[in-house]
Structures are given as structure tokens and as C-alpha cells.
């Protein structure tokens, strides 16, 4: 067995593999972003810039069902970036629909879940 470090710019607690063809490794930890490693790309390239991704948590506050331009505070017609308290916790990919679920606010902030 071989262990390899992968550079990331986000917390890497509680890893959970997804159910996709890329064998994506989803991570949770402190910080206001969802982070992942596309292990298929990592295995092929050993390039963290190509294999690692992240995105901030965003609420669909304008209610149109899609990701739009977003800001840090609610604003007419835009979605809103969300900081889940002490950070996301316990990431869990859904086995059939591809959504990614997190719990939030475990130690501080608003309790809830993110999808």
C-alpha cells in the first residue's frame, strides 16, 4: 500500500468516496467550502491542480432552481453564499442521485444540513 499527500486549500476531515465513475473523494472540515479530489485524475496525473476542486456553499435565495451570481449578503435576484458555522461536517454523497449532503453547525452557528 502506498500513501500520497495531495495538496488542498480546505479542511480534509471525514473523507467519503462518492458513487461516481471518477471515484471522487469528498471532504469536510473547517471552512465555508465543499472540497473534493477526483481520484481518477489524481491517479492518472499526480497533479493536485487538476484533481482537486472546491466551491463555496451557496443558497438558491432567488428561488430559480439553479446556481446564479452570488454575494455574501442577500441581494435581489442573486443567490447567497453561506458560511455553515464551524464548518461542514460528515459529508455524505447520495448513492443514486449524485447530490452531496453535509451537516452543519455542529459546534457553533446554525444547525442544519446542506445539499
Region spans (language model):
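Acidic, glycine-anchored loop motifs typical of Ca2+
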Residues: 1, 43-52, 60-80
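Signature of short aromatic-glycine-proline-rich micro-motifs recurring in repeat-based ectodomains
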Residues: 5-14, 20-22, 27-33, 67-98, ...
Amino acid at each position: 500500500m502506498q500513501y500520497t499527500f495531495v495538496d488542498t486549500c480546505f479542511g480534509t476531515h471525514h473523507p467519503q468516496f462518492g458513487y461516481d465513475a471518477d471515484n471522487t473523494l469528498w471532504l469536510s472540515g473547517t471552512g465555508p467550502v465543499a472540497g473534493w479530489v477526483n481520484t481518477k485524475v489524481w491517479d492518472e496525473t499526480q497533479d493536485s491542480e487538476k484533481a482537486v476542486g472546491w466551491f463555496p456553499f451557496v443558497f438558491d435565495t432567488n428561488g430559480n432552481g439553479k446556481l446564479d451570481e452570488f454575494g455574501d449578503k442577500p441581494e435581489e435576484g442573486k443567490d447567497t453564499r453561506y458560511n455553515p458555522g464551524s464548518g461542514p461536517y460528515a459529508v455524505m454523497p447520495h448513492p443514486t442521485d449524485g447530490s452531496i449532503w453535509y451537516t452543519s453547525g455542529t459546534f457553533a452557528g446554525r444547525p442544519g444540513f446542506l445539499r
